[in-house]
Amino acid sequence: YGTGRDAFVGSVQYLASAPVKTTVENIRAYEDGDKVFLQTVYNFAGAGEQVAFDIFRFDENGLIAEHWDNLAAKADPNPSGRTQIDNYAEVKDLDKTEANREVVKNFLHDVMMGKAPEKTPGYFDNGRYIQHNTGIADGLDGLGAALEALGKQGIQMIYDTVHQVLAQGDMVLAVSEGTFGGAPTSYYDLWRVENGKIAEHWDV
């Protein structure tokens, strides 16, 4: 979509006129200040289901002022039988929002950006890690095996910049950019933090 109300309305009108209607299924939604972040399944005019993360910023009048998103095709269950959207739960630990945001910020710096990889085990509870990435199995071992497999193919997953870290309770969404296999890539990672440890992960 282009910037501005008219560009957005024009795009919506185009979708509305398509022979096959667009469907939207919201999976989960969270709030952080003037921003709302959501996980949603779209099917634009019958083109196939896509899993998305959307971020909306609202202005002082409660109107949508800005939007970011990232989408990927809906895939089959991963090696642990999990999907990109399952395991919904109500948000918890609202009093720990800022502490959980800090856990994820530190994890991004130390692990995902590779500044202190030796700290990786300390971010998990005895290696337990529920994984919804389409190609990675559960556990810290599953993550390590997937990264090793990519390395053998000469593919690097690099995080260069973290743009936003949004949080509500135990749910934290990070918006980052870098490269995957040398190609510029946007990373949207949703983590659930439990007792100060990274417990679960969804991404696009």
Mark where each language-model region is:
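C-terminal and inter-domain tail/linker signature
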Residues: Y1-V204
